[in-house]
Amino acid sequence: MKKIISLILAFTMLLGATFALSSCGLFGDDTPETEKIYVQTNAYFAPFEYYDGTKIVGVDVEIMEMVGEKLNKEIVWQDGDFGIIIDTVKEGKLADCGAAGLTITDERKEKVDFSDPYYTSIQYVILPADSDVATKTTDGVEYIVWEALAGKTIATQTDTTGWIYTDGEINATKDNDYGYAGVLYGTDTKHVEMDSANVAAETLGLTIDAVIVDELPAKYIVANSAKDFKCYPLYYSGEEGQADSPVEEQYAIAVTKGNTELLDAINEVLATLLVKGEDGKTEIEKMVMTHMGMND
């Protein structure tokens, strides 16, 4: 009896060992676990990334999912503060890349590699519908120049391009690293930092006079808010007879330096998405329209 029990136990242990080895791929199972690409974002920047229920969707999401398919890797989205995205990608430990409507800047290029640009945006100003901020019109385009915001309280999302521009125009003097005086320096203009442009917009007309944010998020907020807002492009006044000009920027995806496989794959995907179709529109432009709810 003891011998039979011993044989049963031995057989059971052999089966367990065989299962463990086959689970480790040592018995010809050559199907590897799907590798993952970790993407940092801040999902409050529609139409590029935003929540649809509990799921993150948007233009950047579609782009990166195509990259995942190309490399046969799973895309894992990490939603966090916008201000930590570049540094997190730089370290390369918790994230492989960042996709959050990121503007290419020289300072950021010192920390990360950028993909080819895939969208050109300009800064916009969101105002209450009854705002007294003056506008200008040139060639049929109604816009606001920085000087019109003098003495106002302006809100921006921390560490965004809007934040960078606003901080510089209010605080820059010729004696610091900027090398020039900000347009709003000395005008008693106040700058309030907030977690998102959406949160800032909720205070418009109360403690905030204007919100500065990128064009499409501005239009998305105005179109989807229960409150009555309006928005205009933000321009710099022309000097010495030159025309006024918009505050422009280009979006790209940030990648940890040295990760050429991922960077190349992103650029290859973007190259296909930036080809204009028979209708004269790129796939990126069509994605933008879809997520703005503007499809025909």
Q: What role is predicted for each listed range?
A:
Residues 83-87, 101-111, 165-169, 173, ...:
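A ligand-binding cleft/hinge motif common to bilobed small-molecule-binding domains
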Residues 34-59:
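Short glycine-rich His-centered loop
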